Amino acid sequence: MPVLDIAEFAAAIPDYLPIVGLDPGEKTIGVAVSDVTLTVASPLALIKKTKFSEDAATLFQLMGSRKAAGIVIGLPMNMDGTEGVRCQSNRALGRNLLRLQPHIPITFWDERLSTAAVTRVLIEEHDVNRKRRAEVVDKMAAAWILQGALERMRGIAEAAGKGF
């Protein structure tokens, strides 16, 4: 299955199966999971990057334990809407995951400022110290990314006159 746009992705997800969201960074991959109604995203895990094959195995194990049916990967677009080096890296991650599991639907979601937004919430609203923020910010950013994709998927379904 190729990488899909968000509408195709939404159509490819079976009913009552969750999806995961990824916030890939240089050292870690934040992972979030949706509920089965595709309404709410929650932080799930932080994968510390090692070898791609090991990281992918960890991700697929997490997905299997949650019966997740698809992957939303954050795409850190530049503020002017162009794609930089990090976007290329995240797109390569998607292609490489598809090589290992070609049946899993994958889409990308613009994640501009997701980490900054989550960090601001952690500092201003929860007074979380720097050490604790480092432990949770990437998986919370993954939830932020996934929540945005879920809301767009819901909008697509509603515009088509379908329940979600």
UniProtKB/Swiss-Prot annotation:
Matching entries from InterPro entries are given as: RNaseH-like_sf (IPR012337), YqgF (IPR005227), YqgF/RNaseH-like_dom (IPR006641), YqgF/RNaseH-like_dom_sf (IPR037027)
Which GO terms of the molecular function aspect are on file? nuclease activity
Keyword Hydrolase included in the entry's annotation: yes
One Pfam family for this entry, by name?
Answer: RuvX
- Where is the protein situated, by its record's location annotation? Cytoplasm
**Origin, by domain of life?**
Bacteria
Query: What keywords are annotated for this sequence in UniProt?
Result: Cytoplasm, Hydrolase, Nuclease, Ribosome biogenesis
Q: What is its EC number?
A: 3.1.-.-
One of the protein's GO biological processes: rRNA 5'-end processing
The main location is cytoplasm
Q: Which GO terms describe its cellular component?
A: cytosol
Q: How would you classify this enzyme at the top EC level?
A: hydrolase
This chain's function reads: Could be a nuclease involved in processing of the 5'-end of pre-16S rRNA.
Name the family.
Belongs to the YqgF nuclease family.
Q: Which PANTHER family match?
A: POLYNUCLEOTIDYL TRANSFERASE, RIBONUCLEASE H-LIKE SUPERFAMILY PROTEIN
Stated name of the protein: Putative pre-16S rRNA nuclease
Q: What is the lineage of its organism?
A: Bacteria, Pseudomonadati, Pseudomonadota, Alphaproteobacteria, Caulobacterales
